[in-house]
């Protein structure tokens, strides 16, 4: 019987929303990176065409009727998370704890992380430690282990009183295992001003970083900026300056694309993403990915593009270290070093080192939590084939036929092949995903009306909030 999963995400990988719906409904959960790890997890667990993955938003509370329906309808509740151990997420984490406690089905956390400064210091006290501890206890009553993003989070779990291997396992980010043990080798890079570079960052980072990225753009004319935050997608789609979509920021950094007058807006060199396939397709057109966003750079790695991260905090750093993604930190960045000198001796193939072993750890985590995957099914199929035809030629042929989701080896091509024998890939291949979002003034004429409609609705709501605050 096919499995039925409830999964914490705002959008299914098979959804193809209009720009209007994507921005209005915040399908990226405030950050496009949140699309990537559910996408990968669903691919792994979709063992047949009838496997069900229903998205759920966990921001609010659930009625008794909703809880009864979930318990009766699903085999497990999948909770792929990012930097959930942070103070600004504690309210939703408490909501999640309450939800998990009321469920009778399995509840599995895949890839949770701790957000702190670059030192990863967890020796100080945390006022919200009890909230985090309660969440972990609730989850461990419904699962075998909790999957962590990296070693800094492991230290935090130790601080909370949990034990490695017994209560948790470091598995990295599920997004890195989109193709299983296979990972595309980064395409060769010849550093020069003539390459095409894709840059990712965010507004609330030190000015020295924005200055450095401005220098990168000056040095490499063929550049694109790829924002990930919801407030930037709103600014792109509507033409409303970032100062309106992020009123909590008292000042805007110099050089950052904050409004339609910025050269990146005017020259149509900004792209936003609300589906993973359109994101990867766009990244494949570049030569280099560069910036501060962990999933923006993981997406490039999955697209077979060399990626380099400037880590601003522990949540990014621990994943870069675990998955051996080339990186430096904001603290270590020397503004006087050109991007060409910075990257001159970087080994972009380091992401391949140990990837198979990391995947096997991830696969074991899925096994420990009784989550059957396409990789388990494939292993069973391979064993059956070997029993029927006990020849090395037959085994090699079967391995090649299923290369897109083989459980062994690293791919040596730039773009991994997908296979229609994989239910997820087959379903994705049938969808004509919309291209990336472009700045307001460059939208197709057919999209302008909806963009204008959203613009005036957004401004009206902001105006009403301002009046109510003054009252």
Model-flagged regions — what are they?
Residues 1-393, 398, 403, 408-470:
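Active-site anion-handling motifs in enzyme catalytic cores
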């Amino acid at each position: 019987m096919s499995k039925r999963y409830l999964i914490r995400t705002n959008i299914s990988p098979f959804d193809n929303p209009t720009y209007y719906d994507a921005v209005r409904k915040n399908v990226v959960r405030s950050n496009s990176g949140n699309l990537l790890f559910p996408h990968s997890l669903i691919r792994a667990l979709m063992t047949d065409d009838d496997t069900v993955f229903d998205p759920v938003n966990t921001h609010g509370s659930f009625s008794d009727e909703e809880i009864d329906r979930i318990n009766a309808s699903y085999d497990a509740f999948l909770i792929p998370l990012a930097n959930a151990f942070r103070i600004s997420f504690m309210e939703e984490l408490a909501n999640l704890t309450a939800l998990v406690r009321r469920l009778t089905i399995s509840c599995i956390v895949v890839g949770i992380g701790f957000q702190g400064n670059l030192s990863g210091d967890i020796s100080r006290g945390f006022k919200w430690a009890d909230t985090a501890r309660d969440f972990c206890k609730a989850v461990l009553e419904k699962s075998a282990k909790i999957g962590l993003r990296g070693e800094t989070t492991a230290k935090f779990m130790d601080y909370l009183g949990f034990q490695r291997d017994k209560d948790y396992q470091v598995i990295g980010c599920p997004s890195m295992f989109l193709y299983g043990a296979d990972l595309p080798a980064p395409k060769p890079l010849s550093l020069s001003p003539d390459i095409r570079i894709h840059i990712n960052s965010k507004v609330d980072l030190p000015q020295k970083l924005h200055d450095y990225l401005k220098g990168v753009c000056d040095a490499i004319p063929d550049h694109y900026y790829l924002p990930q935050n919801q407030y930037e997608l709103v600014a792109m789609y509507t033409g409303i300056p970032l100062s309106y979509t992020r009123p909590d920021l008292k000042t805007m950094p110099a050089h950052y694309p904050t409004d339609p007058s910025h050269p990146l807006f005017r020259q149509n060199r900004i792209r936003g993403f609300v589906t993973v396939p359109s994101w990867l397709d766009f990244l494949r057109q570049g030569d280099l990915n560069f910036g501060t966003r962990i999933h923006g750079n993981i997406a490039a790695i999955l697209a077979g593009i060399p990626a380099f991260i400037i880590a601003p905090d522990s949540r990014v750093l621990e994943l870069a270290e675990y998955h051996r993604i080339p990186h430096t930190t904001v603290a270590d960045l020397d503004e006087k070093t050109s991007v060409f000198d910075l990257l001159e001796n970087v080994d972009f193939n380091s992401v391949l080192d140990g990837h198979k072993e990391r995947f096997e750890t991830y696969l074991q985590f899925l096994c420990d939590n009784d989550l059957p995957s396409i990789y388990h099914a494939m292993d069973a199929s391979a064993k059956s084939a070997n029993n029927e035809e006990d020849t090395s030629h037959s085994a090699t042929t079967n391995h090649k036929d299923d290369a897109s989701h083989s459980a062994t080896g690293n791919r040596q091509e730039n773009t991994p092949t997908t296979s229609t024998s994989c239910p997820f890939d087959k379903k994705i291949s049938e969808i004509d995903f919309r291209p990336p979002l472009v700045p307001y003034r460059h939208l197709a004429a057919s999209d302008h009306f909806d963009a204008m409609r959203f613009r005036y609705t957004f401004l009206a709501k902001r105006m009403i909030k301002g009046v109510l605050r003054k009252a």
